[in-house]
Design a protein with these regions (language model features):
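N-terminal beta-strand-loop-alpha-helix module at the start
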Residues: 1-60
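Short beta-strand segments
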Residues: 4-8, 59, 91, 123-125, ...
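A glycine-rich helix N-cap at a beta->alpha junction
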Residues: 71-100, 183
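Glycine-rich phosphate-binding loop signature in dinucleotide/nucleotide-binding domains
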Residues: 112-119
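Short Gly/Thr/Asp-enriched flexible loops that form oxyanion-binding sites at enzyme active sites
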Residues: 130-143
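Electrostatically charged, flexible surface regions
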Residues: 151-262
Length: 262
């Protein structure tokens, strides 16, 4: 059983650094494995322990600068190997720092296709810092593998897999075949902690590093441009001899501004 687990190095919400102006200092805030991704990793390891195979971790560093973050990031990746993953494939490139959800998803999709085919792809339902809940669905469209989200239980059978989806007021059971992408909730398991022996053994497990140029991405802008659009009041005062005249003028202004259509 070939198992791919996607890990995000999120901002450590317990160690947020705030500057004197009250703005979160992203560069000084430490990284940590996103909580739901710990559940994804645990589930991948449990599947490997039951059916055999290999767990491969995939990740991209999205907080920079890369030169400053790399040691902390690789510590996190090494932690996933200590917990039980067999190898890790990571993207280290300044072009992905601050990239959009689509750009990061595309980079990881190309990376996983470059490495090989997998029977099951597991990710957390959302990251603990941005919580966009998008990755599983985006990955599905990019590698053409069906995705089932918000899964709280996985039962792999001889030819099929039963997935228990956690909806608001019910549990939905879906029967499907492999390969499949699964995003898991926090209720699916209790993540384990690595032993000292596992931590030492993790140093011998491989971490494969890639840049954006290694992934044959299409030409698109991986940079983020932030512009603050000027906002100013027009200070239009509506005056008239009576309410009827004022109402007519107000309606005309609203129509001219495109706010009102009659």
């Amino acid at each position: 059983m070939n198992i791919a687990v996607f890990i995000k190095a999120s901002l450590n919400l317990n160690l947020i650094k705030v500057d004197s102006s009250g703005i979160v200092n992203l560069e000084e805030t430490a990284l940590a494995i996103s909580e739901y991704d710990k559940n994804a990793l645990e589930e991948g390891i449990r599947i490997k322990e039951k059916f055999g195979g290999k767990v491969s971790v995939f990740s991209a560093l999205t907080y920079g600068p890369v030169s400053k973050r790399q040691a902390d990031y690789e510590r996190i990746i090494r932690e996933t190997l200590a917990i039980g993953a067999d190898e890790a494939h990571i993207i280290l490139d300044e072009k992905l720092v601050g990239a959009s959800n689509f750009e990061v998803s595309l980079a990881l999709a190309n990376l996983v296709k470059k490495v090989g085919a997998f029977d099951i792809y597991i990710t957390g339902e959302a990251s603990m810092d941005t919580s966009s809940y998008q990755f599983a669905s985006r990955l599905s469209s990019l590698i053409n593998v069906p995705a089932i989200t918000f899964v709280r239980k996985i039962e792999i059978q001889e030819k099929d897999v039963l997935l228990y989806r956690d909806l608001e007021d019910e549990i939905q059971i879906i029967k499907t075949s492999l390969p499949v992408i699964v995003s898991v909730t926090g209720e699916i398991n209790q993540p384990r902690l690595p032993t000292l022996k596992q931590i030492l053994q993790s140093k011998t497990k491989p971490i494969f590093k890639y840049s954006v140029t290694d992934l044959e991405l299409p030409k698109f802008d991986l940079s983020k441009e932030i512009r603050i659009l000027p906002v100013s009041r027009k200070n239009i005062f509506v005056e008239g001899k009576n309410l009827e005249e004022i109402s007519e003028k107000l309606i005309k202004y609203l129509i001219d501004e495109g706010v009102l259509k009659i």
